[in-house]
Structure formats: C-alpha cells, structure tokens
Amino acid sequence: MEDRWLILRFKRGSTDALCRIYEKYERVMLAVAFGLLNDRSAAEDVVHDVFVAFAQSAEKLSPAGSLRSYLTTCTANLARDRCRAIKRQSHIVDPAQAPNAEAPSPLSEVLQGEQLRQLSDALAQLPYEQREAVVLHLKADMTFRAIARAQGLSINTVQSRYRYGIEKLRSMLNGELEP
C-alpha cells in the first residue's frame, strides 16, 4: 500500500516520494545487479540508470503491481544488457565490495568472508541465464512466476534454470567441479 501512495505522490511531483522509493529499494537492486554483474561499480551504474529512467517515466507509472518486482526486473534487464555489451571476463571479488540486501554484523562478516568469496566466484561461473534465475529468486525474493512473467518465459524454464544453477553451485562449492 505504501508503494502505491509513493507512486501517486511522485506522479504529483514529490521528490520526497522518489527519495523514499530509492531508500527503500536501492539495497535490493544493488544486490541483484552485483549478483548478475559481479562488479560493484557496474552494479551501481545500473541502479543509477534504472532510477533515472524510473524518474523520467513518472507520467507512465501505474500504482498497480509490485514496485519491488518492477524495479528489480528493470535492474536485471539492464544488467543483462550490460553483460551482453561488455562480454567481460569474470574476476575474483572482494567480499567487502559485495552489497547485501541486509547489512551483516561484524562477526558474521568475519565468519563468512571466505564463503562469500567462494560463492561469488562460483556464481560468476554460471551461465548468465542460470545466474539470473538464482539471483532474482534468492536476492530479490522474486517468485518463479514473477521471474517468468518479467522475462517472457515459461515458469518451467525459469525453474529449470534455477535448479541447474543451484546444482552447479553446489558442485563447485563442494569441489566436484572446477570453477
């Protein structure tokens, strides 16, 4: 309900509403973009560009539907476009660069540092379609149905990509496959 109210306020010219939308969704969008691009700077650029496009499309916005799903889908689509354009080599990521949807405690950062590094490396090795399904489902909390609708795919295709991605991640993290 708050999202509909924010959209209506934003359509009427409230910059405070846009700021609130940004504050509310920036972390999850950054987590999605980083999970797909494996590059913090590129992820920040994607989130910035999505918000600029969002702000410029105020008159076209509809208060119906999930704003979170809309923004994370826009983020995933732009990240996909950037991946296609860049065709860059994946690299080892410093877990300190990785944005999380929720800020971890210092103790959990210390305990999970190596695991995060291994997970980032393994995630970067997945085919893009599988990585996208995994990131959208786990980091953006999107349902398979919402992902399928946003990408114009069948729900079975999305579930298969997710399942294959999770299986490959599990194999890589258990040392069964080389990254």
Language model segments and positions:
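Conserved RNAP core-binding helix
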Residues: 6, 22, 30, 40-57, ...
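Arg/Lys-rich amphipathic alpha helix in sigma70-family domain 2
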Residues: 56-63, 73-93, 112
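Structural recognition of an alpha-helix C-terminal capping motif at a helix-to-coil junction
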Residues: 31, 45-52, 65-77
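Sigma70-family region 2
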Residues: 11-12, 38, 48-66, 85-87
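Helix-turn-helix DNA-binding module
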Residues: 1, 121-132, 136, 140-160, ...
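Internal acidic/polar
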Residues: 89-112, 116
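C-terminal edge and immediately downstream basic/flexible tail or linker adjoining helix-turn-helix-like DNA-binding
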Residues: 5, 9, 91, 112-113, ...
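N-terminal module of bacterial RNA polymerase sigma factors
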Residues: 1-28, 35, 145-146, 167, ...
